[in-house]
Amino acid sequence: MGLGYLCAWRATEANGIAMMWAMIILVSIGTGFFKGNVSGINGRLFPLADQDELDTVFNLQYMFVNIGSFCGTTFLSLIGTNAGYRTMFLVCGIFLFIDCVWWFVGMKSFGDAGKKPFLVDNRSENVEKADKEKDNAPLTKLEKNRVIAILIVTVFSGIFWLIWYMAYMPVYYEFGPVSQGGSGWANWNIGSFEMPTAWFDSMNGLLCIILCPIFAGIWAKMRQRPQGDWGMFTKTAIGIIILGLCTGSMVLAAALSGQGTKDPVGIWVIILASVCMSLGEVIFSPLGNAFISKYAPKKLLGTMLGVWPLIIFFSGKAYGPLYNWLGNFDFVKAYGVVTIIIVACGVIMLAFTKKFDKMVEGK
């Protein structure tokens, strides 16, 4: 990833297209090697007996990820606007090389986690038994059901991320201030200060930093109840429904502003949209890696952890065309339908949570 950003740093008018594609390819490959395996190692740092702690662990991991997101959108964006984007890419590359050194120095603290490929179930066995483990046995019926359950959660998470990413577009281009390229449906002023639209990204990162440890505590408390914590499917469904409140708030704000024909609505719509997006995200997204670490068959762990970011990639590719297509229709009607569909997806998943839970528990 660091090499990718250095390619962008060296981009010129003559080689810019090639260097930017080099950056995209290298960063994508680096992310593929890095992201899923880091989550796998984090999952293996905790023994099988403490698997319920994984929800808390991955909530905290998600918090630190969003510290990076918040700092990047808040501070690195200032480097881009003041010193140029090539300088910003150079700084990104330097940080990643520092991170690489930090990783190698800190590897000794991982113990046995990550020393062997995820073919051995060292969640419950000593890693020294790795070479003796037979990994060519077919999947059991329970393992197949768990793979299906993981894929179901992943598909619904893809729906969530598709709408989540797309929600940024009306915030910027319909509700954004005219001075920043928007249509001015909302007033971004705080007193005499006009909030930069880039801070909407920062707001999400900041809210995730605040909410992740809070929800980690909530899940820990809920596990102590006689009925236990909510399952992954319930949390995913609730996260999707809350995201529906985000698009619903935009529909209300668009109607109040007359879609630009009346006075702009207050900044409340921006804040409410960000809160709903962040709440929906924090309720289920950090737990995806925990869920996969708990239930993925040992020899498919790395692959299944890679499927999670893969579906996010497809959502990231699809939201732009979807936003452009919705632009052909009346905003209130189009996004009203989107709200109904996303809430319906959450309700459908909520209705089948018991069946899905039985699939992963083998009941």
Regions picked out by a protein language model, each given a short descriptive name:
Residues 1-16, 238-262:
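C-terminal ends and interior cores of transmembrane alpha-helices
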Residues 1, 221-241:
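Cytoplasmic membrane-interface "Motif A"-like loop-to-helix N-cap segments
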Residues 4, 16-34, 259-283:
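Hydrophobic core of transmembrane alpha-helices in multi-pass small-molecule transporters
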Residues 4-5, 23-24, 93, 99-100, ...:
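A generic transmembrane-helix signature of 12-TM secondary carrier transporters
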Residues 33-48, 283-296:
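Intracellular juxtamembrane helix-capping segments at the cytosolic ends
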